[in-house]
Amino acid sequence: GKYSKSIELYKKALSFDPNNATIINNLAKAYFDIGELKIAEKYCLEALKINPNDGNIQKILSLIYLRQQNYKVGWHYFDGRLNLSDFVEKNSSINLIRKKLFFGNKLKKDSKILVLREQGVGDEILYGTMYKDLFNKCENVTIECDKRLKNLFCNSFPEYKNSFVNLGEISNDKNLLSNYEIVLYAGSLGKYFRTKSAHFENNNYLYPDENSLNKAKEKLK
């Protein structure tokens, strides 16, 4: 198959350039894609030794550990995505908020926290499963969201509906941003609230507005 061919080519390239972290990481990714997680981990750690600050390597390593259900270590490396060029390009406010990005292991109850959505509506809905945990733990939370999802989030968390604002409303405004102590991207909430398999509940958490739902149903008739 194509993966066998890729692995063969990467190994050949590696024989000419054995300390090339990019080739080693590509090899790790190929093994990850075919489910050979232990081999993928071995190559990824090798690449990380050569280039410890490479976001691509950290991201692949995080996916390996998350797939292995080694959640604490997986989420730790998941923050590597914040340094990737495609992540930076799609998040225009990252240079404004970078100094406030939080990488600590514990969230304080009274910290003023701004949460930014991840790329894409699908990711935003996925990581939104942790918003309830965050609201329960911390008192001062504001969440920026895609404007298409704002009403849905407000309806799903009625007691916290004032905590949701449109994307960029705060993160693109230096003055408003100064009111917040720390900033987190939604995907980074995993290291605080999803560190065991038992933390992943299969419950519905999104509830559309009844009027909007009825109107949509009428249109489909």
Predicted regions and their residues:
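Alpha-helical solenoid repeat scaffolds of the TPR/TPR-like class and their adjacent stem/linker regions
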Residues: 1-221
